[in-house]
Regions:
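N-terminal leader/linker segments that precede catalytic domains of diphosphate-processing enzymes
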Residues: 1-53, 59-114, 155-157
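NUDIX/MutT-family hydrolases
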Residues: 106, 117-151
Length: 157
């Protein structure tokens, strides 16, 4: 689905960032039946920007959306996640582009259990990954830069 946010934004140094109005991703956490904490990761399709890396379901924000709305919409599109099973806990700006208003916001959310997922064409795979195994994967550089601080967040609820 194309929205008015699809397209590149450019920093004052010429570096490009996806999302004309910024971008957002969903860090969805859920316990396995054995209690191990997991997060849902997307193995990005090879044709996509930074293809072949693991990251969060997410993408460009449209002009009328909050970061939370964009992250949940993208997770529905890319993973088939039901919005009514997701509880948003926080929104954290984890990247910005020099000289612009562009930001990437990670929306941290919880689900009571591992939810079934259905990948779209933007994913090679979707996987619930134990938190302690995330850093061992070939991560998208932006997600890699923020993972440890996101993992360390302790939120009420």
């Amino acid at each position: 689905v194309r929205g008015d946010g699809d397209g590149w934004a450019f920093s004052d140094t010429g570096v490009r960032f996806w999302g004309r109005h910024g971008a957002a991703g969903l860090l969805l956490r859920a316990p396995r039946p054995d209690g191990i904490r997991t997060v849902l990761l997307q193995h990005r399709a090879w044709w996509s920007h930074q293809g072949g890396t693991w990251a969060l379901p997410g993408g460009a924000r449209d002009s009328h959306e909050t970061a939370e709305q964009a992250a949940i919409r993208e997770a529905q599109e890319e993973a088939g996640l039901p919005a009514d099973r997701i509880v948003v806990r926080a929104a954290v700006v984890t990247a910005s582009a020099s000289g612009t208003s562009w930001t990437y916001t990670t929306v941290v959310a919880d689900a009571d259990e591992l939810l079934p997922v259905v990948p779209n064409r933007e994913s090679t795979e979707l996987r619930w990954v134990p938190e302690h195994d995330v850093a061992a994967l070939p991560l998208h550089p932006g997600f890699a830069a923020s993972w440890e601080s996101l993992r360390g967040l302790r939120l009420p609820g």
